[in-house]
Amino acid sequence: MQLIYYISEAINFIELNYQKDITVEDIAENCGLNRNYFGKKFKEEFGKTPQEFLMRFRMTKATELLEHSQLSIGEISCAVGYNDPLHFSRAFKNTYGISPRQWRDKYSSD
């Protein structure tokens, strides 16, 4: 099969499972590929590792929830696949330069 098929399968798997505690191994296994080969080809295609892509996808979903819901930071953390709200908040701040609460205050539509 062509690489584009496997990449498409990976993206689909991430979109359907980002809220779970999934790993790069899970994504590669779902595609039927070796983790190292999958990671190398994914990075060639997207310019970032599967883990970086997954984290960015989760952070994007988190911004949507922060802007358009009344869920707590802890609830949003769980909703996007982080078991620890503190770990989520640190990852969010590393990604966007502000905390989830600051993001909500700045961009919330409520």
Residues covered by each model-derived region:
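…primarily DNA-binding HTH/wHTH and HhH modules…
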Residues: 90-110
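Terminal helix-turn-helix DNA-binding modules in bacterial transcription factors
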Residues: 8-16, 21-25, 44-83, 105-110
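Basic, helix-initiating cap at the start of DNA-binding domains
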Residues: 1-5
